């Protein structure tokens, strides 16, 4: 995958525009997310383990917000000989184009349908696994219930949703502590104070994290009876919900 270094916010801007997954971001996304999201590599690798255990024959797998295809690739490596199909969706044409290039570098008998579109418009059908990897936090909060409803209805019994998100915490002391630890993580990965500040400003209006309690209540409302966090580092977590 592309390993160009993320320097998007390294120079000072007079006006910071809202963050978007454009060509500039797509070109450095692999570097950006691994230097910004603690545990990202572990989450991606473990998606393959989830797929190995839960993906069933003749079913669909959905990667909603697929970006460069890291989750799709991890899943695909573990599900040969199951006659499945992966539907990978992203609303960024730049991401889809680079995802297509990344997927073509690896041979697999499992087909991948790449869709450039809004994940809210995708009907989930005959799914044994659905992945939302740091995607739902960019949706308007009012749209999150309907998205999960669509996913739940389209999952086979015993199918899973893996939901990875940045978190907020109701306890202000915990919130402050984990935010500070995350900022130290970014500094340790080479981001300057200017880059951190400008990136934070660009995300302010487009990324709206929930608390774990909000996630749990939303999943329970849609019908998921089994739900828990399987990975957390600072204010980033990945959850699994079983239908």
UniProtKB/Swiss-Prot annotation:
It comes from the Bacteria. GO terms for molecular function: carboxyl- or carbamoyltransferase activity; S-adenosyl-L-methionine binding. Its EC number is 2.1.3.-. The keyword S-adenosyl-L-methionine applies. It catalyses: prephenate + S-adenosyl-L-methionine = carboxy-S-adenosyl-L-methionine + 3-phenylpyruvate + H2O. S-adenosyl-L-methionine binds at residues 40, 65-67, 90-91, 118-119, 133, 200. GO terms for biological process: tRNA wobble uridine modification. Keywords: S-adenosyl-L-methionine, Transferase. Catalyzes the conversion of S-adenosyl-L-methionine (SAM) to carboxy-S-adenosyl-L-methionine (Cx-SAM). Belongs to the class I-like SAM-binding methyltransferase superfamily. Cx-SAM synthase family. Homodimer. PANTHER family: CARBOXY-S-ADENOSYL-L-METHIONINE SYNTHASE (PTHR43861:SF2), TRANS-ACONITATE 2-METHYLTRANSFERASE-RELATED (PTHR43861). NCBIfam families: carboxy-S-adenosyl-L-methionine synthase CmoA, PRK15451.1. This is Carboxy-S-adenosyl-L-methionine synthase. It comes from Shewanella sediminis (strain HAW-EB3). The gene is cmoA.
């Amino acid at each position: 995958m592309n390993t160009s270094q993320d320097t998007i916010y390294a120079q000072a801007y007079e006006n910071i525009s809202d963050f978007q997954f454009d060509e500039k971001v797509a070109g450095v996304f692999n570097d950006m997310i691994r230097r910004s999201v603690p545990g990202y590599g572990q989450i991606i690798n473990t998606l393959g383990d989830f797929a190995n255990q839960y993906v069933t024959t003749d079913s669909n797998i959905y990667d909603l917000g697929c970006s460069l295809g890291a989750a799709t690739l991890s899943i695909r490596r573990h599900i040969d000989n199951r006659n499945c199909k992966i539907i990978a969706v992203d609303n960024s044409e730049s991401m889809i184009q680079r995802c297509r290039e990344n997927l073509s570098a690896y041979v697999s008998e499992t087909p991948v349908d790449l869709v450039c579109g809004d994940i809210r418009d995708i009907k989930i059908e005959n799914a044994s696994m659905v992945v939302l990897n740091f995607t739902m936090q960019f949706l308007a909060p009012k749209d999150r219930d309907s998205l999960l409803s669509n996913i739940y209805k389209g999952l086979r019994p015993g199918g899973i949703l893996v939901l990875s998100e940045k978190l907020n915490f109701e306890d202000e002391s915990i919130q402050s502590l984990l935010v500070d630890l995350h900022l130290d993580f970014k500094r340790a990965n080479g981001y300057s104070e200017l880059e951190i500040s400008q990136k934070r400003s660009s995300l302010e209006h487009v990324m709206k994290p929930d608390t774990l309690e909000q996630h749990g209540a939303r999943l329970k409302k849609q019908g998921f009876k089994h739900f828990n966090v399987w990975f957390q580092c600072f204010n980033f977590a990945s959850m699994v919900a079983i239908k």
